[in-house]
Amino acid sequence: MPKLRPGHFYIALLLGAIAATSFAQGAPTFKVDPSWPLEMPNHWIMGAVTGVFVDAQQHVWVTHLPETLTEEELYEQQTPPMATCCKAAPPVLEFDQQGKLVQGWGQGSMTDFTDWPREPHGIFVDHNDFVWVGSYNRHRVMKFTRDGKHLLTLGEYEKTAGSADTKLLGGPSGIWVDPKTNEVYISDGYRNRRVIVFDGASGKYLRHWGAYGNVPDDTERFDPKTMVSGALPKQFSTPHGITGSNDGKIYVADRRGNRIQVFDHHGRFLAERVIAPATLSSGSAFVPVLSPDAQQQWLYVADGTNHKIWILRRSDLEIVGGFGRGGRQLGQMLRPHGMSIDRQGNLYVGEASTGRRVQKFTVQGSAR
């Protein structure tokens, strides 16, 4: 397959290749770690996982949705208790490297919507140790201290005004903070169709852009079925995850657009890669994660519809492999929806829907 040229697109994967897994020479391989995480205290269990992030201390942060747990799963939590287990864990959780729970907070998200991100979606711990949490269904991104003290809110509770608005958000899904500029990049995509950037200290609006670096248009309608024949949406379909590289590039996972788009920090379009174009439903490109080596050679993409992780070579966005398949057994995945990486190159994958867990995949090959 030829190298990807900036501004050029083509279908990257044949229809029959979705279920196959192959590796280019030197591409990393992974093995599930059955010992991670450890059992949580207090009979706590997770709901659908919506975000995962590994911070500078190599601690793993997780957001999940307690409201997705059923009454049967929460018998101990009923009034009066109906059984000896279980209870919903707080929606924001911090685990150490060994998988032991360090803390959990955010219980107020179920009752107090002023200081907590109800229905959290996406989490990021920045270079100043502040914790950013999104709220996709309530249109806010909120900044906290490590122990959960609320500091700043971007957007307003349950208010949205479209992709042209510079104050309100519309279904924020992913967060990345540039350590050099302290700018907050948000994939604003469950309702809006854009990337939007704010100052991380003041919350001041800075800029935004849509697919291909153009002005976003919320009125465009696109039939995903046409992607099978090579058509691509002119607008973002669902910008769902975002990250930045050491060399100044921004990677956006356009979930229902089945693609990764690459920009510079000002929103100038550089390249894109289509992933599993035959994927309908909710799309193939959920979350982008870069490998921790200095060159950031690999780009990993969580695919919550095909239930796997794709491996791309970052230099040309060539798909060089992948791992995972749908299922509930160890090492299988059901709706991988959040993902992050530690400095050793190990991946942490959080599962939404009824997956409701985080698994650690230890790197075996050359991913550092």
Which residues does each PLM region occupy?
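Eukaryotic scaffold repeat domains enriched in small/polar residues
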Residues: 23-368
